A protein has these predicted regions:
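Acidic, proline/glycine-rich low-complexity IDRs
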Residues: 79-132
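N-terminal domain-onset segments
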Residues: 1-98
């Protein structure tokens, strides 16, 4: 708390900034962990597998071919689609259990569905899902 021009105000920015700064300082490691969680969820037949299967069923063949262009065609289409998932956005929600929300996409112009990974403020994975 701080008295400012006759008003008492609460200052939370420093704590939120410190939390944010700590998270950002370890962003590369968090990204590695998030992407490992995506791979693990896929291999376990979880939501990421559903995301991949859904798009292979719903997208037309020419779109799939365009999305998979440049990937290793000796691998199954599922693996290739998984390999083109790219980080699109990280949303930060100070004070929330899901402090950072990582959005991955095969291309926003192709599909509005996202693979979403939620982490706490320490970068620990809370859960992996897919949503629009």
């Amino acid at each position: 708390r701080m008295l400012f021009k006759q008003n008492t105000i609460n200052l939370h920015l420093l704590l939120e900034f410190a939390e944010y700064e700590s998270y950002i300082k370890n962003l590369k490691q968090h990204k590695t962990n998030v992407e490992a969680a995506i791979r693990s969820d896929y291999e376990d037949g979880g939501d990421v597998k559903e995301y991949v299967d859904f798009h292979l069923e719903e997208l037309d063949a020419s779109t799939i071919d365009n999305v998979l262009a440049g990937t290793d065609d000796s691998k199954p289409k599922e693996e290739r689609l998984l390999s083109v998932l790219k980080l699109d956005r990280i949303g930060f929600y100070p004070g929330d259990e899901n402090y950072a929300v990582w959005d991955y996409t095969i291309g926003r112009e192709i599909a509005d569905m996202l693979v979403v990974v939620n982490t706490n403020s320490a970068g620990e994975i809370n859960y992996v899902t897919w949503e629009s």
